[in-house]
Amino acid sequence: MKTQTTHAAEQHAAKRRWLNAHEEGYHKAMGNRQVQMIAIGGAIGTGLFLGAGARLQMAGPALALVYLICGIFSFFILRALGELVLHRPSSGSFVSYAREFLGEKAAYVAGWMYFINWAMTGIVDITAVALYMHYWGAFGDVPQWVFALGALTIVGTMNMIGVKWFAEMEFWFALIKVLAIVIFLVVGTIFLGTGQPLEGNATGFHLITDNGGFFPHGLLPALVLIQGVVFAFASIELVGTAAGECKDPQKMVPKAINSVIWRIGLFYVGSVVLLVLLLPWNAYQAGQSPFVTFFSKLGVPYIGSIMNIVVLTAALSSLNSGLYCTGRILRSMSMGGSAPKFMAKMSRQHVPYAGILATLVVYVVGVFLNYLVPSRVFEIVLNFASLGIIASWAFIMVCQMRLRQAIKEGKAADVSFKLPGAPFTSWLTLLFLLSVLVLMAFDYPNGTYTIASLPLIAILLVAGWFGVRRRVAEIHRTAPVTADSTESVVLKEEAAT
């Protein structure tokens, strides 16, 4: 028995060495300051700055509770990811962990679902950029696709010049987002605390009770809204991908993850509560940031425009992060055979440029959608992005559970940074993600049609696997000698099925 355990541990160690070889070529240039701000910025994006307006109309003050619930489960997912990162930092993030603990088929599904997530999220961000630009009347007649193309040019260039520059620019993007929320919280609190009227109307809790209470449309609309709010936290797992290019991920990642939960509480829950105490919840509009709505009503010249520049930066930040993630995820998939061979190529700046260019092509499709149906793009692709997010987060939780099992069996070393309450919190998070899928079905028509498309997505994934399995088998036949013969046989048999 002891011999079998030892052999299993050696076999798993061999697989880890093979996976670590996939990290060659990256430049570990990110410092603590940058990782901290990337983690914060990942939790603050278009979902809050643009999506909150429409969601306040749908759920009213109950949106704060929805953000809190989603924020707690997002923290569980981040802690699970942190556990995996301390086990083995990887730019391939949970796709690489799926390959280690679940096999190549799981890595294939995880990778392509995550790509769907970021591809759709990028289209949402492109749409957001165009909507923000239309806030200024001078640009009202300019088609959305013009602004979308300009945004793609900017972020595409940023991602090609090296990870150090990406991290630095993302640091400043995130800092601007944080400062915007902080300024709103300070100004809004002053108005609320001093009893200063806004547009001649008193602020305070009466704005909730006088406008239908905490659940103005009932409980069901607030519950269904969870599937939309999930999108607001879509970038939190970015810190896992960034860990592969950190100078010291063992110290930086836990610190960054632990700082996220209270910031979610302050920035999301605190902001929504303050918004509904300053203005009636139905004063906020879909298509316009609620923060822009608030500052515009202060009567201070140009304050609305200044805030609009800030939220425009937030959309560009999210788009920038999406390109960063997809480039590295596609390279990880390519190294295992689940994506085309050319996507593994790196530039002299240590950038996986092929994957980034492939993502840019998909984003161009988003620009085309902006041209065809500019008014509906945001909601249409939001639901498809949610599918990718749910799948990605589910893989993180399952991989974390398999890591715990591997540690228990002696196949992997224990880690100091763990998900609190596991495995209960692991199963609870998976149940939450499943409930989000169920709730999406009630969001007619977009959510209902999205859930109805799941069989088609499954068929496409199966067809795609048959297209890549030969290359998967070939890669594992020529795997480096660090993987032992038994491991190679297992991998080759898996690829052949």
Swiss-Prot record:
The keyword Disulfide bond does not apply. The chain crosses the membrane at residues 34-54, 58-78, 109-129, 146-166, 171-191, 219-239, 264-284, 298-318, 353-373, 378-398, 422-442, 448-468. One of its GO terms (biological process) is amino acid transport. Keywords: Amino-acid transport, Cell inner membrane, Cell membrane, Membrane, Transmembrane, Transmembrane helix, Transport. It is a multi-pass membrane protein. One of its GO terms (cellular component) is plasma membrane. It is found in: Cell inner membrane. Gene3D superfamilies: Amino acid/polyamine transporter I (1.20.1740.10). InterPro entries: AA-permease/SLC12A_dom (IPR004841), Amino_acid_permease_CS (IPR004840). Pfam families: AA_permease (PF00324). The keyword Cell inner membrane applies. Belongs to the amino acid-polyamine-organocation (APC) superfamily. Amino acid transporter (AAT) (TC 2.A.3.1) family. This is L-asparagine permease. It comes from Salmonella typhimurium (strain LT2 / SGSC1412 / ATCC 700720). The gene is ansP.
